[in-house]
Amino acid sequence: RDDVESRGLGDVYKRQILFLVGSYAYKTNGAMVLGTAEAGAKITLYNLDNLNPKTVNAKTAYFKTIHHEFGHILNQTKPYPTDFAEISGPDYVQDQCFEIYKTTESALQKGFISPYASKADGEDFVELIALYVNRSAEEWEEMLTTAGDTGRPKIEAKFEIVSNYMKSTWNIDLNELREIVLRRAEEAPNLDFDSLDDEDTDTPENSGTNE
């Protein structure tokens, strides 16, 4: 593992369960579920039957979902500062997020990094982590530029809390993590998954990692 993964995360990794499901999951309202995080220990990822390792990259839902859900695991283990929720407090819209914000641009201009981030402060927090580490510095700046004079200050204020939390609580520098994630995403299509050694991948210490 890269050094950034092991800093302060030993206990989290030891108890983490990664559960992979081939099909999609759906909520009672018909919304598709890409992943879930439970009790600070279990991540479930769905629709793996449709994952093509030759085309997966940092912009696909899989990379973002993994970091989104692991962000929840971290928050469930050690909560983030309560002042984060105050920045966009009255603007969270729960399950109406995709109805109210039909485009990423409209969400950005309201101060949310994605439409889904407007659901609740917990989703907002982990969406900032997931999108930051899966986008280049140039792409992130483009999003902030789109957010404009109203949305940008809110996103930047929230991200400062996110970044400080990750560094002070878990000793993870998000800039360093982003470099690793983008590198791995670029390498993913060239990996030979058929030749993975079962002896290496089935051991408890490797279970649930993203190598």
Where are each of the predicted segments found?
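Single conserved hydrophobic/aromatic residue that forms the stacking wall/gate
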Residues: 2-13
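A generic structural signal for short, solvent-exposed coil/turn residues
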Residues: 10-11, 35-37
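Intrinsically disordered low-complexity regions specifically enriched for long asparagine
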Residues: 11, 15-16, 30
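Extended hydrophobic secondary-structure segments that form protein cores and membrane-embedded regions
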Residues: 16-22
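Active-site-flanking segments in enzyme catalytic domains
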Residues: 23, 27-28, 34-36, 42-159, ...
